């Protein structure tokens, strides 16, 4: 049985942070999963399936984010989104 709720701490390491292209890639990946996905920064929580929500976090390089996934495919979603962030959104 896989976890229904997963929380991961992420650090933004790409040069420009989460701007339009990384936000779109994150949302495209997130929308492949049925689970709920939320991203938190500095006490503000946004829907991880919303480009505008992610961009409102103003997450620049070095920003610390908390990823919350909840649902039947939560573990897989969290893993794929963590890989995306770790690989700098494939920008570099």
Q: What function would you assign to each model-found segment?
A:
Residues 6, 42, 76-77:
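Hydrophobic alpha-helical segments and their boundary regions
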Residues 3-9, 64-66:
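Intrinsic-disorder/low-complexity, polar/charged segments enriched in Ser/Thr/Lys/Arg/Asp/Glu/Gln
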Residues 2-5, 90-92:
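Short, charged helix-to-loop "capping" segments that act as catalytic/coupling loops
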Residues 11-52, 56-60:
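Compact, glycine-rich, soluble single-domain proteins
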